[in-house]
């Protein structure tokens, strides 16, 4: 595990998991990597949340279906729901957005307010709730409370995840600038480029 963008693994990789605190930019990075390496991006939130935010019964079957394909990138989440046990053995690269709390917090506030104001559809007809929900202390009802509750999850969980999955290459990115520099270095590295 190295920190300098020039010394980080450059790939390309065929199956990628992106870990990080809620709001850190996992989905945004997944889209960027999908474009850089010609991978299929499957957003786990779209598989998990059915209409009216009800969890879909077919979630794990859907995860297993796309995980069995050869080329994908997705967010490393829903591990407590069983997705980790399906995705981790197949993945080749784990990218960990280990950003400072204030960076992820600012990004999540901006994203939540924007989604709430625009009422943009997220997944399966669902939309961000009222901004008044941000005053609720229940992490199941307030994404900011959820972020606070889970803020140390990856720092606690990553060592065990890597021990369970010694085949994974890890790229740990500690700032958006470091992420941008790493992604910029991927330009021109197609799926057929030498690794």
Question: How would you label these PLM feature ranges?
Answer:
Residues 40-99:
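Conserved nucleotide-sensing/catalytic segment adjacent to the nucleotide-binding pocket
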Residues 26:
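Conserved lysine of the Walker
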Residues 99-153, 192-194:
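A glycine- and Lys/Arg-enriched "phosphate-lid" helix/loop adjacent to the NTP-binding pocket
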Residues 29:
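Hydrophobic positions on the alpha1 helix immediately C-terminal to the Walker A/P-loop
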Residues 2-11, 141, 145-195:
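NTP-dependent small-molecule kinase module
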Residues 22:
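The conserved Walker
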Residues 18:
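Hydrophobic anchor at the beta1->P-loop junction of P-loop NTPases
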Residues 32:
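Active-site signature of alpha/beta-hydrolase-fold catalytic machinery across serine-
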């Amino acid at each position: 595990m190295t920190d300098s963008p020039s010394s980080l693994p450059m790939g390309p990789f065929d199956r990628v998991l992106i870990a990080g605190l809620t709001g850190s930019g996992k989905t945004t990075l997944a889209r960027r990597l999908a474009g850089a390496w010609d991978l299929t991006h499957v957003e786990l939130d779209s598989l998990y949340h059915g209409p009216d935010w009800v969890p879909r019964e077919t979630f794990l079957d859907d995860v297993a279906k796309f995980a069995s394909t050869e080329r994908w990138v997705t967010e490393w989440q829903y591990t407590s729901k069983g997705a980790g046990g399906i995705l981790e053995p197949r993945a080749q690269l784990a990218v960990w957005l280990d950003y400072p709390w204030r960076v992820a917090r600012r990004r999540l506030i901006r994203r939540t307010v924007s989604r709430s104001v625009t009422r943009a559809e997220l997944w399966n007809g669902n939309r961000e709730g009222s901004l008044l929900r941000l005053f609720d202390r229940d992490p199941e009802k307030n994404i900011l409370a959820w972020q606070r509750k889970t803020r140390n999850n990856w720092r606690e969980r990553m060592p065990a995840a890597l021990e369970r999955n010694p085949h994974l290459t890890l790229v740990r990115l500690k700032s958006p600038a470091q992420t941008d520099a790493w992604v910029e270095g991927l330009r021109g590295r197609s799926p057929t480029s030498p690794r």
